[in-house]
C-alpha cells in the first residue's frame, strides 16, 4: 500500500482510521467515543472505555506466550555491564514496585515524580505508576533543585522516586542532595520518597520520609493493573517555557498507545522480537515514547543505554552496542553523530564491529544538517531518515513512512506529513503559502491521538501558547516551507 493511499484513507475517514488502529491494543472496555469534540478547541480521543498502559506494554505479551522474550537490554558503558530483562521479569519488578506504592497510599490520578538516571529501575518506576493509574512526571536526573521544586509544586506530587546518583564520564552526580534541596524549596511537600541505592554512591535517607527501594519492594505484594479511561493522563512531561514557568504537557493514555503502536510498524518499520534503540534519555520525550512505551506496547526489544556517543570509552561505543545486541534501527539526535564524526572523522572505530543487523538510522530532535546526514549515510551504507516532531505531539508528525512506503530521501527535508496531522505553512495572517515560501508550520485541529489535549491545570495557557495565533490550527512555533511534492 502506498503512503498517499494510507494518508488519504485517514483524511477521508479519520475516525474510522483511528478506530481500526485502536483494535491493535487491548481495552478492558472499548472507548465510548473515538473523538469527543464537544468542548472545542479541546479535543479528546478514545474517551470512556477502560484501558491500562502497563497491561498493554507488559502483561498482554506474557498472556500471548511471549513472557521469555527480552523487553529491555540495559547496556551501561558507565558500569561496563549488560542486563537483559524479559517481559516476565519486567512484570514481576513492576508489579512489586506498584504494590509498594499502593501500600503507601498511591492511587489512580495521584502524581508521582521520577528523578532517575538511565537504569532499568527508571522504566520500572514509570510502568509501576501506569499500572496503578497514577500519573508520572519524569524529571531529567540531575536537573537543578529549583527546576525540580517548580515541578513538585505544579503537579502537587504525592511521592518522588529517585536514584541515589547518576554517572557521567569521570564523575558521580549525587541526586539526593538535589532532591532534598528541591523539597525544601517547594511549597508542596510530597508524602514520601523512594530511593534506589546504586552501588556507586549510596544516599543518606531521612527517617520517616525516605524509603529504600529494595526494602519496600521485598515486603510488597504484587499489584494488579487498574483500568483508566482512554482520555486519562498517562503522564505529565514538562517542557521549558520561555516565560520561566514550565509547561506541563499532558499525555492521554489511549491515544498515546494507539499512535505509538502504529508508528513502530508503519513509520520505523520495526516489528515484534526485533531490537530497537532510541539513544536518548527517559527524561526527554524521545525516551518516554521510544525507549519505553512504543517498543514495549508493540512487543519489541528496547535498548536502554547509559553512556555517551564518545568518551565512554571512545567513538566506537554506538557501533559496539549495535553489534552486540543486533539492533535493527537506531534513533538518535544529530548532535550524537556530530560528536562521533568530530572524534573519528574517518570512521575507523567502525572497522572493529559488524553492523549487519542495522537497517536504518533515524534522526530527530534538532535540524539534521546535510553534512552529518551524508557522513552517516556514507559510513553506515544504510538509509538515514530525518523526521520532525515535538514533546507536544508525542510521536512523529513529518517523516518518511518507512514501514508503509520508502519514499525518496531529500536531504534537508524530514519528508511528508504522517496520518493524523494535516500540516500547512502559513503567513502572518494565517493564509496558506504557496510552495517554497518560508512561513509558520501549523497543524489543523484536531491533532492526532496521543498529542497533548491541553497543559496540566493550564487550559488558558494552552490556548494562548498554541491555538490563538491561527484559529483552527495548532501553532508549532517552527518555521519551514513545503516544496512542490508536499
Model-identified regions with their sequence ranges:
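Gly/Ser/Thr-rich phosphate-binding loop
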Residues: 300, 328-332, 341-408, 422
Amino acid at each position: 500500500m502506498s503512503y498517499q493511499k494510507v494518508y488519504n484513507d485517514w483524511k477521508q475517514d479519520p475516525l474510522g482510521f483511528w478506530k481500526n488502529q485502536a483494535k491493535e491494543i487491548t481495552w478492558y472496555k472499548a472507548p465510548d467515543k473515538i473523538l469527543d469534540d464537544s468542548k472545542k478547541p479541546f479535543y479528546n480521543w478514545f474517551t470512556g472505555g477502560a484501558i491500562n498502559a502497563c497491561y498493554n506494554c507488559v502483561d498482554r505479551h506474557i498472556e500471548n506466550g511471549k513472557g521469555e522474550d527480552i523487553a529491555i537490554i540495559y547496556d551501561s558503558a558507565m558500569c561496563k555491564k549488560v542486563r537483559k530483562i524479559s517481559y516476565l521479569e519486567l512484570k514481576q519488578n513492576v508489579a512489586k514496585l506498584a504494590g509498594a506504592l499502593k501500600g503507601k497510599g498511591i492511587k489512580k490520578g495521584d502524581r508521582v515524580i521520577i528523578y532517575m538516571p538511565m537504569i532499568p529501575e527508571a522504566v520500572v518506576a514509570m510502568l509501576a505508576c501506569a499500572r496503578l493509574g497514577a500519573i508520572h512526571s519524569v524529571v531529567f536526573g540531575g536537573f537543578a533543585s529549583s527546576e525540580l521544586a517548580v515541578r513538585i509544586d505544579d503537579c502537587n506530587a504525592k511521592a518522588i522516586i529517585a536514584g541515589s546518583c547518576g554517572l557521567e564520564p569521570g564523575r558521580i552526580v549525587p541526586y539526593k542532595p538535589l532532591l532534598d534541596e528541591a523539597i525544601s524549596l517547594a511549597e508542596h511537600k510530597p508524602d514520601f520518597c523512594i530511593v534506589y541505592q546504586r552501588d556507586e554512591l549510596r544516599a543518606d535517607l531521612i527517617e520517616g520520609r525516605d524509603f529504600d527501594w529494595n526494602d519496600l519492594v521485598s515486603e510488597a505484594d504484587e499489584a494488579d493493573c487498574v483500568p483508566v479511561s482512554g482520555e486519562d493522563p498517562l503522564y505529565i512531561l514538562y517542557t521549558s517555557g520561555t516565560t520561566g514557568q514550565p509547561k506541563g504537557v499532558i499525555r492521554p493514555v489511549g491515544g498515546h498507545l494507539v499512535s505509538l503502536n502504529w508508528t513502530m510498524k508503519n513509520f520505523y518499520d520495526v516489528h515484534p522480537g526485533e531490537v530497537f534503540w532510541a539513544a536518548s534519555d527517559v527524561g526527554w520525550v524521545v525516551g518516554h515514547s521510544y525507549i519505553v512505551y512504543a517498543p514495549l506496547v508493540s512487543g519489541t526489544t528496547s535498548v536502554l543505554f547509559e553512556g555517551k556517543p564518545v568518551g565512554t570509552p571512545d567513538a566506537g561505543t554506538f557501533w559496539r552496542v549495535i553489534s552486540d545486541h543486533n539492533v535493527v534501527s537506531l534513533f538518535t539526535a544529530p548532535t550524537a553523530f556530530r560528536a562521533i564524526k568530530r572524534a573519528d572523522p574517518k570512521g575507523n572505530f567502525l572497522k572493529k564491529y559488524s553492523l549487519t543487523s542495522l537497517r536504518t538510522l533515524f534522526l530527530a530532535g534538532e535540524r539534521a544538517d546535510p553534512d552529518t546526514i551524508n557522513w552517516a549515510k556514507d559510513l553506515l551504507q544504510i538509509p538515514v531518515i530525518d523526521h520532525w516532531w515535538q514533546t507536544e505531539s508525542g510521536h512523529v508528525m513529518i517523516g518518511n513512512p518507512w514501514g508503509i512506503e520508502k519514499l525518496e530521501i531529500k536531504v534537508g527535508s524530514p519528508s511528508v506529513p504522517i496520518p493524523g496531522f494535516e500540516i500547512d505553512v502559513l503567513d502572518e495572517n494565517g493564509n496558506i503559502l504557496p510552495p517554497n515560501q518560508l512561513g509558520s508550520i501549523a497543524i489543523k485541529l484536531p491533532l492526532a491521538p496521543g498529542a497533548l489535549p491541553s497543559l496540566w491545570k493550564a487550559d488558558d495557557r494552552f490556548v494562548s501558547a498554541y491555538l490563538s495565533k491561527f484559529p483552527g490550527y495548532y501553532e508549532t512555533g517552527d518555521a519551514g516551507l513545503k516544496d512542490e511534492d508536499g
